[in-house]
């Protein structure tokens, strides 16, 4: 996929990249609450914290149902918070004014990709595809981190990490390394926008 990220000069940043497979998984819903945020019960959902999920075919509370259960749009996926093994909250979604849930429905989400076999990662930032590397991030110096437990690659920047990088748009790619191969997790045309530093008086 082609990613779009933004960071600001002079500011630290911790950016999570959730790495998913192309497999769409479904878990049966047994309850949805008229609350803010919306809380959904789906026994044994296995959805990591901060993942994105959609709702399909729920009865009663139909407001968040995907228009087509077999062609779910990107905008129909919402970030969820892991509450426990059977429950998630839909971040920023108030269901207080929704119709009451009656039955049925599924949580739909792309299954997390296993990162257990990967030993390192690197990210090269360039002015153009095939150009010189302006900024190199990697797991060796701690600017990248592989969190296999949550299928997440973290970008970790200190407030001085971008001192030598002018504010503008760049392209980047990220590669994961294991014993026998190197796998790209995003398009080489992914965009990193470096924003100018905002200074304040002390």
Language-model segment annotations:
Residues 26-117, 123:
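Small/polar beta-strand repeat architecture
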Residues 1-25, 111-202:
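Contiguous segments within soluble domain cores/interaction surfaces
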């Amino acid at each position: 996929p082609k990613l779009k990220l933004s960071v600001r000069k002079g500011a630290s940043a911790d950016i999570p990249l959730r790495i998913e497979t192309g497999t769409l998984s479904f878990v049966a819903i047994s309850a949805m609450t008229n609350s803010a945020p919306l809380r959904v019960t789906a026994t044994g959902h296995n959805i990591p914290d901060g993942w994105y999920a959609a709702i399909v075919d729920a009865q009663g509370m139909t407001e968040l149902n995907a228009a087509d259960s077999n062609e779910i749009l990107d905008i129909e996926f919402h970030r969820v918070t892991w509450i426990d093994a059977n429950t998630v909250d839909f971040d920023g979604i108030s269901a207080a004014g929704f119709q009451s849930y009656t039955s049925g429905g599924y949580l739909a989400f792309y299954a997390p990709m296993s990162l257990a076999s990967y030993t390192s990662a690197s990210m090269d930032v360039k002015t153009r595809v095939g150009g010189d590397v302006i900024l190199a991030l990697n797991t060796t110096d701690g600017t990248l981190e592989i969190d296999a437990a949550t299928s997440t690659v973290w970008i970790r920047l200190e407030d001085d990490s971008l001192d030598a990088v002018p504010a503008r748009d760049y392209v980047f790619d990220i590669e994961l390394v294991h014993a026998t191969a190197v796998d790209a997790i995003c398009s080489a045309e992914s965009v990193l926008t470096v924003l100018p530093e905002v200074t304040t008086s002390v």
